[in-house]
Amino acid sequence: MSHNDTIPLYQSSQSDIDEIENMMNDSFQSGPGTVLPARPPSPIRPSIPVSSSPFVQSNLPPLPPSSSSSTQKVMPVPAPPPLPSAGNEGNKSIGGSGFGSPPNTLTEPVWDTVKRDLSRIVSNLKLVVFPNPYREDPGKALRDWDLWGPFFFIVFLGLTLSWSASVKKSEVFAVAFALLAAGAVILTLNVLLLGGHIIFFQSLSLLGYCLFPLDVGAVICMLKDNVILKMVVVSVTLAWSSWAAYPFMSAAVNPRRKALALYPVFLMYVSVGFLIIAIN
């Protein structure tokens, strides 16, 4: 077969070729119009970093090192004091330095307790019997108040009056003790009802300590049986006791009600002075 020879096509083959060409033309013509728009791309989601450490790290940049920290010298840490060996030395070091728990007073010797109470009584007695008029806050002088001192002075005054009496010694002691104890309670309630800023037992302690000058006067009058001497001694000790109670009671109440608080105190001390003079 030469190149000039051609293969004749049948009618069915020619129609198939024409049909394929028509379909291809139709597909090219209708293609651009029926293509759906492309789906917009989804936004990029931020990724969450996963850390294996239990603490969340901050995104803030680290602070730059200061120049002073590089030049600053590291101070050496002082070594702790050596522990006491054992026994009484350890207790003395803790109690003397003031560190640790306070000493247990339940296990201390009786003599140490008595010395501590006596020193407290002497300190409070100095504050009351010798008041300082220039003290900034005289009303708070008895912060460490106690009732042993006032109880002792009340009992001592009752015993002194009973020893001075020639008859009915027990009745004299009962009257003196009841007068002083009930009078101190009534005077304290009077100050509180007047709006005074004072503790109940602190006021009882104060009024009991102020009886010390009258105790001294009762002892002098018991030793010297002279009416004129008794009157002079009682007048001096009465003024002393009133002067000792004045700064504390006046500071506890309103200045407008000062007389209402001081007059009953003076009246009770006058009654005690009358008992000292009258008992023979």
Curated annotation (Swiss-Prot):
Disruption phenotype: No visible phenotype. The double mutant yip4a yip4b exhibits disturbed trans-Golgi network (TGN)-Golgi association and cell elongation defects leading to reduced roots and hypocotyls growth associated with an abnormal cell wall composition and a mislocalization of trans-Golgi network (TGN)-localized proteins SYP61 and VHA-a1. The double mutant yip4a yip4b also has a reduced number of root trichoblasts displaying Rho-of-plant (ROPs e.g. ARAC4/ROP2, ARAC5/ROP4 and ARAC3/ROP6) patches and leading to an almost complete absence of root hairs. Residues 168-171, 214-230, 280 are lumenal. The chain crosses the membrane at residues 147-167, 172-192, 193-213, 231-251, 259-279. Its main location: Golgi. Residues 1-106 are annotated as: Disordered. Residues 1-15 have a biased composition (Polar residues). GO terms for cellular component: endosome; Golgi apparatus; plasma membrane; trans-Golgi network; trans-Golgi network membrane. Residues 1-146, 252-258 are cytoplasmic. It is a multi-pass membrane protein. One of its GO terms (biological process) is root development. Keywords: Cell wall biogenesis/degradation, Golgi apparatus, Membrane, Protein transport, Transmembrane, Transmembrane helix, Transport. Disulfide bonds: none annotated. GO terms for molecular function: protein homodimerization activity. It holds the Pfam family Yip1. It is found in: Golgi apparatus, trans-Golgi network membrane. InterPro entries: Yip1/4-like, Yip1_dom. It comes from the Eukaryota. Expressed in developing root hair cells. The keyword Ion transport does not apply. Belongs to the YIP1 family. Together with YIP4A, involved in the regulation of cell elongation during root and hypocotyl growth. YIP4A and YIP4B are central trafficking components in Rho-of-plant (ROPs, e.g. ARAC4/ROP2, ARAC5/ROP4 and ARAC3/ROP6) small GTPases-dependent root hair formation, thus contributing to activation and plasma membrane accumulation of ROPs during hair initiation. The ECH/YIP4 complex is involved in the modulation of the trans-Golgi network (TGN)-mediated trafficking of some proteins and cell wall components (e.g. Homodimer and heterodimer with YIP4A. Component of a trans-Golgi network (TGN)-localized ECH/YIP4 complex made of ECH, YIP4A and YIP4B. Interacts directly with ECH. This is Protein YIP4b. It comes from Arabidopsis thaliana (Mouse-ear cress).
